[in-house]
Amino acid sequence: MWVFGYGSLLWNPGFEPIEQMRADLPGYRRSFCMLSIHHRGTPEDPGLVLALDAAETADVCAGLALRVDEREAEHVLQELRARELISSAYVERWVDLPLADGRRERAVTYVVDRDHAQYCCYGLDQQAEIIARAVGGRGSNSEYLFKTADMLRDLGIPDPQLDYLAKKVANLTKSA
């Protein structure tokens, strides 16, 4: 089984992949378009988490394909579902994923449900303000942003929006 990671699964997959490789998923973009009321915010003060959002243009989301040992596949899938489907804001999708070495593998990933109440479309500056202040059950929203932006840089995956947000949030949290 393969898993496509584009956010926290990059730096905290929750399992030990037996193989990992850069992968680019066409038709989606990485976006802070989901309100987080559990992991990185609360119902009273929601944070924002990344989701795959269907792209209206020819966008591609760059991330990692993480291969799960088949003996662990069912357990890992149950754990992923418990983590990612904590609310119904994500929808599980099995996608045809092009890997960097030319292979194509069927992979599970999690896509935002645009009809869900947690779906949102804020500008970058408003996203930064939310991320700078929100804290949830798994820690601060800024930690989530910084770890994801750092991992993308380490992997050589450019994401100008996350870089902008990381700088903006760092400035906001310094002045707080």
Pin down the residues of each PLM region:
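A glycine-rich, hydrophobic/aromatic-adjacent loop/helix-cap motif
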Residues: 1-176
